[in-house]
């Protein structure tokens, strides 16, 4: 039977406290795999695409069926191995080993190109896992809302005396990641104009309240933005158009936004960025009939897009790359100064990473939103003094639409992750929530990624491209007993530009789970503090000392013998 990437099937994760697998440690990855393909979550579930161009949850439908069958049958002392979305083996391990180990999209560096990957993909030998698509912990656009919110808030602190009121953000892309931008801007107090070339994506964001309004034309959009900024209102506006047309036009008109960024799927020129003048259907057809020509056309449009961003930057508008590698694509097309504006991590986020603060997330396997609201309250109780975090949780409850199983994103660091995990496990044990909770994170975290054009751009010691760190993170999480661990290549910025690791752990209310949580939710963020301390960041060294880390080559953390 030929392998199929298309099936007209609606998948939703089971809800409630009844198991379909043999334990919660195997039920959890089963439900989260299915949740990734829920039509309320995934961008194109019938083709197994979760987000980010062609980021898939399984290699093909036959592999999906086999994964579901394997997880249903998996014993408490067995581990399932997934190779680029394909279940390749079940092995006897032990009770505290991960139940699933995942490796997606990894290629020997010399061959780590889109061209070679696409050849393998066409032969059914590989799958692009993005970050949380192939690692089964995607929670919809909420997963990046807080990180984007924190970025915008910090930009307001740095450039506009601490407030974005009466300001507006210009950006593009309303896909799985980019769709978070308008809501994040609104929560940060700013208006936003987001350019998106697919009407279906705008419709989805309007329906889920991530976007407030759609403008009919550019003039209409600018009039709305002018009206709302004068009134001091934070309203998000979408425009169906091509960013490679609109941004240069805005430059020509002398329009001056207050912040400029971008979250189109520029990391994947074959599937993720519509060339100017093309229809989406034409783009899809030519991706098959003329892949090289299609990629070149997309990159030419990206070059025009980046040149406009450079022009805004030259005007003095704070302009930053939001991690889609569009600067690299433009540079390959001859825009030699493409990197004259920074990425968002060195510009705004790195101090958080130095303290192990990153995108901690959890999901209620029950499917009951009340379980998330109860955990929100528990977070406020434990992290009692962080009013900024409390404000985020209040806004999230009011504005964020759950996609699939109810979930929450909450940026916390080394000091708090273990404490929160243990508290959630106790809530499960006592019956305060109606079923177990899974805790995971984005691969975009402080110690789990090497990505010189994004998370590890401009490291103090020049170690941007050293990818030992995510490998060590994956190995340590495996040794610590995470429920499933993943190691991917190419997420966010595309083939050849990143390696990254993920972990998920189940809170099932048992003492054994508590022991695993103590190890995993300390060690995982501690690798981020370690990585930044090793690179020479004083803030990370201070955090390492405060949290009692032993880093043999960092003098301040030496243990007295």
From Swiss-Prot:
Known EC number: 4.2.1.49
Cofactor requirement: NAD(+)
Alphabetically ordered keywords of this record: Cytoplasm, Histidine metabolism, Lyase, NAD
Keyword Lyase recorded: yes
Annotated pathway: Amino-acid degradation; L-histidine degradation into L-glutamate; N-formimidoyl-L-glutamate from L-histidine: step 2/3
Localization: Cytoplasm
Keyword Cytoplasm appears in the UniProt entry: yes
Entry's Gene Ontology molecular function annotations: urocanate hydratase activity
Superkingdom of origin: Bacteria
GO biological process terms on file: L-histidine catabolic process to glutamate and formamide; L-histidine catabolic process to glutamate and formate
GO cellular component, one term: cytoplasm
InterPro entries: Urocanase, Urocanase-like, Urocanase_C, Urocanase_central_sf, Urocanase_CS, Urocanase_N, Urocanase_Rossmann-like, Urocanase_sf
PROSITE patterns in the record: UROCANASE
One Pfam family from the record: Urocanase
Principal location listed in the UniProt entry: cytoplasm
Cofactor: binding comment: Binds 1 NAD(+) per subunit.
Active site location: 410
Stored Gene3D superfamilies: Urocanase like domains (3.40.50.10730), Urocanase superfamily (3.40.1770.10)
Binding positions (NAD(+)): 52-53, 130, 176-178, 196, 201, 242-243, 263-267, 273-274, 322, 492
Its biological purpose: Catalyzes the conversion of urocanate to 4-imidazolone-5-propionate.
Family: Belongs to the urocanase family.
Protein name, as recorded: Urocanate hydratase
Lineage: Bacteria, Pseudomonadati, Pseudomonadota, Gammaproteobacteria, Enterobacterales
Gene coding for it: hutU
């Amino acid at each position: 039977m030929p392998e199929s990437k298309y099936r007209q099937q609606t998948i939703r994760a089971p809800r409630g406290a009844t198991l379909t697998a043999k334990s919660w440690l195997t039920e959890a990855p089963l439900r989260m795999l299915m949740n990734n393909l829920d039509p309320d979550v995934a961008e194109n579930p019938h083709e197994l695409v979760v987000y980010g161009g062609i980021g898939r949850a399984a290699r093909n439908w036959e592999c999906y069926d086999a994964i579901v069958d394997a997880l249903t049958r998996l014993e408490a002392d067995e581990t399932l191995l997934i190779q680029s979305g394909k279940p390749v083996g079940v092995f006897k391990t032990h009770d505290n080993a991960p139940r699933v180990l995942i490796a997606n999209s990894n290629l020997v560096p010399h061959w780590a190109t889109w061209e070679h990957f696409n050849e393998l993909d066409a032969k059914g030998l590989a799958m692009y896992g993005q970050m949380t698509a192939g690692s089964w912990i995607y929670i919809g656009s909420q997963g990046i809302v807080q990180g984007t919110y924190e970025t915008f808030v910090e930009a307001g602190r740095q450039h506009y005396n601490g407030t974005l009121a009466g300001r507006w953000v210009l950006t593009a892309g309303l896909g799985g990641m980019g769709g978070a931008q308008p809501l994040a801007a609104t929560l940060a107090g700013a208006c936003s104009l987001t350019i998106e070339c697919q009407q279906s994506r705008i419709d989805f964001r309007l329906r889920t309240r991530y976007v407030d309004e759609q403008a009919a034309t550019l003039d209409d959009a600018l009039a709305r933005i002018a009206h709302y900024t004068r009134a001091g209102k934070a309203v998000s506006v979408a425009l169906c158009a091509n960013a490679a047309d609109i941004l240069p036009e805005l430059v020509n008109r002398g329009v001056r936004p207050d912040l400029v960024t971008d979250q189109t799927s520029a990391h994947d020129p074959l599937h993720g960025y519509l060339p100017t003048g093309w229809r989406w259907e034409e783009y899809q057809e030519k991706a098959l009939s003329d892949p090289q020509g299609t990629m070149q056309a997309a990159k030419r449009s990206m070059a025009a897009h980046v040149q406009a961003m450079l022009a805004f930057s030259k005007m003095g508008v704070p302009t930053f790359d939001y991690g889609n590698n569009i600067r690299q694509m433009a540079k390959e097309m001859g825009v030699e100064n493409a990197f004259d504006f920074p990425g968002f991590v060195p510009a705004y986020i790195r101090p958080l990473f130095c303290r192990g603060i990153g995108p901690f997330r959890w999901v209620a396997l029950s499917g009951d939103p009340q379980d998330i609201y109860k955990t929100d309250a528990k977070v406020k109780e434990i992290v009692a003094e962080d009013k900024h975090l409390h404000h985020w949780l209040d806004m999230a409850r009011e504005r964020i639409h759950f996609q699939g199983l109810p979930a929450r994103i909450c940026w916390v660091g080394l000091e708090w992750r273990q404490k929160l995990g243990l508290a959630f496990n106790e809530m499960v044990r006592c019956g305060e929530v109606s079923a177990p909770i899974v805790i995971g994170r984005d691969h975009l975290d402080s110690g789990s990624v090497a990505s010189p054009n994004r998370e590890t751009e401009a490291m103090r010691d020049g170690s941007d491209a050293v990818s030992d760190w995510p490998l060590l993170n994956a190995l340590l999480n495996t040794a610590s007993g995470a429920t499933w661990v993943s190691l991917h290549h190419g997420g966010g910025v595309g083939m050849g530009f990143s390696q990254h690791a993920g972990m998920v752990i189940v809170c099932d209310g048992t003492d054994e789970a508590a022991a695993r949580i103590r190890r995993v939710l300390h060690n995982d963020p501690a690798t981020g503090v370690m990585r930044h301390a090793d690179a020479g960041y004083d803030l990370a060294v201070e955090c390492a000392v405060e949290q009692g880390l032993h880093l043999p080559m960092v003098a301040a953390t030496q243990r007295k013998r």
